[in-house]
Curated annotation (Swiss-Prot):
A GO MF label: nucleotide binding
Gene3D superfamilies reported in the protein's UniProt record: 3.30.70.860, YajQ-like, domain 2
Name by which UniProt lists this protein: Nucleotide-binding protein PMN2A_1813
Family recorded in the similarity comment: Belongs to the YajQ family.
Pfam families tied to this protein: DUF520
Cellular component aspect of the GO annotation: cytosol
InterPro entries linked: DUF520 (IPR007551), UPF0234-like_C (IPR035571), UPF0234_N (IPR035570), YajQ-like_sf (IPR036183)
Keywords in alphabetical order: Nucleotide-binding
Length: 165
């Protein structure tokens, strides 16, 4: 039996599920009567999406469909950071959607402080873009997971728990 147990708190999403949601979004935009002639283009890069269309209203409709498709693919809506809609040339508008992945130093510090203040039997250490919680007892780790889940709404980021051992 190991002398200590641990798990990692991370903020990630399944890239393939996002690609699938974007493909579904493109198909629906091509088929919907109100969006068919809007010249809407959705491009996906490593850490952002760009939506280009004729009007703000069309972009808002595409945004709603994106959120709906992401929900159906079990993606957290907290991964999307919608930027301001910008006007670009040719009577077109564009919106950049940044994709949140990984824990920032600030959020890692807040989570670490939360765990240290409320749980005396576990330790938290920041490891790059994740946070490792270690304790001698599995029950203490379960309590730490429950504590973090209760406070998750304070952090505007999707949290997952991995490597529970």
């Amino acid at each position: 039996m190991p002398s200590s147990y641990s798990f990692d708190v991370v903020s990630e999403f399944d890239q393939q599920e996002l690609v699938n949601a974007i493909d579904q979004l493109r198909r629906e935009v091509d088929q919907r009567y109100d969006l068919k002639d809007s010249k809407t283009k959705i491009d996906i890069k490593e850490d952002e999406l760009s939506i280009v269309s004729l009007s703000d209203m069309t972009i808002e409709s595409v945004k709603d469909i994106l959120l709906q498709k992401a929900t159906k693919r079990n993606l957290s809506l907290k991964i999307f950071d919608f930027q301001k809609i910008e006007t670009i040339g040719g009577n077109m508008v564009m919106q950049i959607v940044k994709l949140k992945k990984g824990l920032s130093q600030e959020i890692s510090k807040k989570l670490s402080k939360l765990v240290r203040d409320n749980m005396k039997k576990v330790t938290a250490s920041i490891q790059g873009d994740s946070l490792r919680i270690t304790g001698k007892n599995k029950d203490d780790l379960q309590a730490a997971i429950n504590l973090i889940k209760k406070q998750e709404e304070e952090f505007d980021i999707a949290l997952q728990f991995q490597n529970y051992r």
